[in-house]
Amino acid sequence: MMTGVHYIGVIAVLALIAFVGTFSGKKVSNASDFSTGGGKAGTWIVAGTIMGTLMSGQATIGTAQLAFNFGLSAWWFTLGSGIGCLLLGAVYAAPLRNSGSTTLLGVISTAYGHMAGYIGSILSSLGIFISVLAQVVSATAMISVIFPVSIPVAGLISIVIMAFYVIFGGVWGAGMGGVVKLILLYMVSIIGWIIVWRIAGPSEMISNLKTLLSGTPLGSVNGLETSTEVVHQYMNLTARGAMKDIGSGLSLILGVLSTQTYSQAIWAGSSNQVARKGALLSALMIPPVGIAGIFIGIFMRTHCITTAEIQAILAAGQAVPAGLVELANTAQVFPAFVIHYMPRLMGGITLGTLLITVVGGGSGLSLGVATIIVQDLIEKRFQALKGTKMELTLIRGTIAMVLLLSVVVMLSTQSTFINDLGFLSMGLRASVIFIPTGCALWLKGKIGSVWARTAIIAGPLTVIVGNLLKWSFNPLFISIGVCLIVMMMGLVANKRVTSV
């Protein structure tokens, strides 16, 4: 149960982030400072911008939630994110900075013409907006749990916090806020891990899992009958199936390489080396946070039961195991751990940190959407805006509109539907950006614009069709294959023309 001490901790974290957001605004004098930090950001600001967005609700609350049911396989989100950052730093950083553009769609537009850029900008913005929407939903849920307010009020509070986080300082705000959030997140993760370790180490948790789930009514409602099945489900990186779990990791890798926000951090670096180090630092620091979430999720599995599980056990005429904390749903795993097992002040700080984790993801992504809309769509029509104070005002205003629109959509759409759209978001981003950008960087001038436009349309169309038809596998990979085939056809066609 929330207490006054919990609220003091939450408010302290929110006040700290608000201060960082307004302080970072002093470093912004033009649109370049806002969108790419004026190319003056150091290693930690680059890393903070990347991690501030990547380490969102899925990396923390979502990891603990998945670990509650599937143990180690919950690591794929943060593991895939880390590998994506590794490739971003080792392979993409220098080519992106040397491209002469400040957006991924700008890279595509320069190589394949303005029409390819326009089409890609619209589709990519839609994909990123869906992710912003998901983060607003998560933040609203957290706020409605922490504070006794209605969902609409919680939604408005969430976007106000996001605005403080990024709208004043842009990349500086996302980067500085990301560094602060990283420090807080590591602190609460380490403390959470220590608490779990002191109460029950790994061997004891495995033993408790076997006792709770092997040949028991609770195990039966989860499809587990033997201790071997329990160990396989909780101590296996591919517990949900190799195609699903490894596919999830690959989706994250492609998503990191195909999202404006993370590339924006690369352009913000003061040099190629700084940008590379920032991405590599992110690659090193993201996966351990997932491990802490896994420990907490497995620990809570041995101490909690969901309302749905209680109902299923009672419906089967069995006795509900005593001494377990009831959770309304598995999304409450991490918050429940904080409230029940952490000291109150530390628990409040942790809840505030989790809220900011979700907020940081939404604010960073909204910055990416705004940059694409202004620099890749509006300024292509009104070039006089480029480099003016009006450009900065326009980017800030676009961020505010994106956040407001996300609240409106959230209030008019069921959350389950929004969660399903999360998969579509990742697919849209990667299918639009990944292959065309790679070809623009490494095969520049060797593929005609008509082929690029075809690939940019065919890729996301495949993702949309796959989601509508509910394919049993991730349609993203088919779409990547379609894009690759189209671009390779363009490469062959270009070679034939030049050889004639």
Feature map (PLM): residue ranges:
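Helix-loop-helix module between adjacent transmembrane segments
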Residues: 75-169, 251-255, 356-363
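Hydrophobic, small-residue-rich membrane helices and short re-entrant helix-turn-helix hairpins
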Residues: 31, 101-105, 109, 170-180, ...
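A generic transmembrane alpha-helix motif of multi-pass inner-membrane proteins
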Residues: 1-23, 449-500
